[in-house]
A protein has these predicted regions:
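C-terminal membrane-cytosol helix-exit motif in multi-pass small-molecule transporters
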Residues: 166-169, 190-211, 396-401
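Central cavity-lining transmembrane alpha-helices of secondary-active solute carriers
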Residues: 56-74, 269-281
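Juxtamembrane intracellular "pre-TM" segments in multi-pass secondary transporters
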Residues: 2-16, 204-234
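Helix-to-loop junctions at the C-terminal end of transmembrane segments
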Residues: 68-80, 165, 278-291, 374-375
Length: 403
């Protein structure tokens, strides 16, 4: 334990100011996202909508990535990842303001599409931005730390989000499940997103050449479109596995176990904590077993964790949800680092956008179908489908060549 702690402190001491700025952004944006993740479905319910509408909104957001994912990648390669990230954050703020003030369902759907577009632009730009400020030998570590930065703060956001409606209701004299309470609570995420933009507003310094890198690695030939697509393929099934459940995660724990908003917030906080710890867990495993093998087997482990959620007791279900977060959180930074390592710098925007497109496609279709399935058969088929999708995504990683 002492050795691990010493290694961690040494690794953190080697991080450049550019990396610390990105980590600060990820923590703040992760805090904002955790609030919207918990409260938006409750907001829809307070407006009188049901699970199928929640699935529709999730599908609309992910469809934006599906439709605009490739143009987003071209934009990132054209204007640069930092400018793209800032543009995405500004658009995200404007779209959320419009969403909360929209007078009708159709206006909300349009605003949600813009929210999805902005989110895809922001998160897609972050991947090549990180790849551009670190050398190959540090990439897995930095990607894991960045995933942890955004996810470890998630429990704080989930707990705050669970308490915000009650606190706001007391302040304005309404009920904790009233529209006004949820609307004002969601507005806090808009403020946090604006603060998250501050660390990345200033340009990043040019990365010095890596003295340990070979000339062949520095001058890698361009990959064909199909080669890049093959590296991104695992994202499709990862999107399916997330889309069938994550848009409904709060409704699952509320409806299946009768939990309050605050209790649901605690459960989601544990999952976010698992995601954050997973990012740290994946770093030493990737170093020991390689990015491909570690990423693939860690994602495979998410399947039995999902099956644990079939147990009709809150503690086993919550434990399964935590473990799912742990294994997914450990696997996806390794897969992202693997793709960026295999892709020449001039194609990283394309590679990141393809991962986003496939992930969005899987999520959008899965969320829409899942909302319909739940109305007739409940959550059991959803959990089984997620497990199968995690297995398929893991196999897609394991079938890649080398690290």
């Amino acid at each position: 334990m002492i050795i691990s702690s010493t290694r961690m402190r040494g690794a953190l001491a080697q991080l450049s100011p550019s990396v610390w700025r990105i980590l600060a952004h990820s923590m703040l944006f992760g805090l904002a996202a955790s609030i919207t993740d918990l409260l938006f479905n409750f907001y829809l319910v307070s407006l009188g909508y049901a699970n199928d509408t929640a699935g529709l909104f999730s599908t609309v957001a992910r469809s934006a990535g599906l439709v605009l994912g490739l143009p987003v990648g071209l934009l990132i390669d054209r204007i640069g990842p930092r400018r793209s990230l800032i543009t995405g954050l500004a658009l995200f703020i404007a779209a959320w303001v419009a969403l909360l003030l929209s007078p009708s369902l159709w206006a909300m759907i349009v605003a949600q599409f813009v929210v999805g577009t902005a989110y895809i632009l922001a998160v897609t730009a972050l991947t090549p931005l990180m790849a551009g400020v670190v050398h190959d030998r540090q990439r897995a570590q930095v990607f894991g730390l960045n995933a942890s930065a955004g996810n470890i703060i998630g429990p704080v956001g989930s707990i705050i989000a669970g308490l915000l409606p009650t606190m706001i209701a007391r302040a304005i004299g309404g009920g904790p499940q009233d529209v006004a309470a949820y609307r004002l609570a969601l507005a806090s995420s808009i403020v946090l997103t604006a603060v998250a933009a501050l660390p990345v507003l200033r340009p990043f310094p040019t990365l010095a050449p890596d003295p340990h890198a070979s000339a062949a690695a520095a001058e890698r030939p361009a990959l064909s479109f199909w080669q890049v697509l093959r590296y991104a393929w695992a994202s499709l099934l990862l999107g399916v596995s997330g889309g069938v459940l994550l848009p409904f995660q709060n409704l699952f724990f509320r409806n299946q176990f009768g939990l309050s908003d605050a209790a649901v917030g605690l459960v989601l906080a544990s999952s976010a904590l698992g995601l954050g710890l997973g990012g740290l867990l994946g770093v030493p495993l990737g170093r020991r077993f390689g990015l491909r093998r570690a990423g693939g087997w860690l994602r495979m482990a998410a399947a039995p964790a999902m099956l644990l959620m079939l147990v009709p007791l809150v503690l086993p279900a919550a434990a399964g949800y935590f473990l799912r977060g742990l294994f997914v959180g450990a696997s996806y930074p390794l897969n992202d680092a693997l793709v960026m390592q295999a892709t020449p710098p001039r194609q990283r925007g394309l590679a990141a956008s393809l991962m986003s497109v496939l992930w969005s496609a899987g999520w959008a279709v899965a969320a829409l179908v899942s909302g319909w399935v739940q109305l007739r058969w409940g959550f059991a088929p959803v959990l089984l489908a997620a497990s199968v999708a995690y297995i398929g995504s893991a196999l897609a990683i394991l079938m890649l060549r080398g690290d």
